[in-house]
A protein has these predicted regions:
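Short, surface-exposed linear patches
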Residues: 62, 72-76, 87-88
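Conserved aromatic
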Residues: 5, 63-67
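Short aromatic-glycine-(Arg/Gly/Cys) micro-motifs in beta-strand/loop hairpins
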Residues: 32-62, 79
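Local beta-strand/beta-hairpin segments that build beta-sheet-rich folds
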Residues: 28, 52, 61-63, 92, ...
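Negatively charged, low-complexity tracts enriched in Asp/Glu with abundant Ser/Thr
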Residues: 1-33, 114-117
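A short, charged, amphipathic alpha-helix used as a generic interaction element across diverse proteins
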Residues: 67-81
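Intrinsically disordered, low-complexity charged/polar segments
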Residues: 82-117
Length: 117
């Protein structure tokens, strides 16, 4: 759908404006989401937008449905913001974070240079 391409572009621009590029997210993708992603999908049959977060590849936190893109957009961006807040809390409490992001981690993880990324 052409409108979903436009909506995806809008979300990508918002993500860039907010400085959220290092976060994990999936926007109207046909592929299965990865670990720790915030996902926005559109169900053509139900005509609903769904927002949810994945944990590992096989599980997710409850799906929230929205009738309009504007509602879904706000929820998606809020979810990303909440990911930042929770991981900042984890850092403050010396707990492991879900993944590395400069938005909450002071130092990048130690990466073995012999392992290709």
């Amino acid at each position: 759908m052409e409108i979903l391409k436009l909506y995806k572009q809008q979300l990508l621009e918002e993500i860039q404006n907010l400085g959220y590029e290092s976060l994990r997210y999936s926007i109207f993708s046909d592929k299965n989401p990865g670990e720790w992603e915030v996902v926005i999908e559109f169900d053509k049959l139900e005509q609903l937008y769904f927002i949810y977060g994945t944990m590992d590849r096989g599980s997710y936190n409850g799906k929230h449905s929205f009738k309009t893109f504007e509602e879904a957009k706000i929820a998606f961006l809020q979810f990303l913001y909440d990911i930042i807040l929770i991981n900042k809390y984890y850092v403050e409490q010396n707990m492991p974070t879900n993944y590395y992001s400069p938005l909450w981690s002071k130092n990048p993880p130690d990466i073995d240079p012999r392992i290709s990324q």
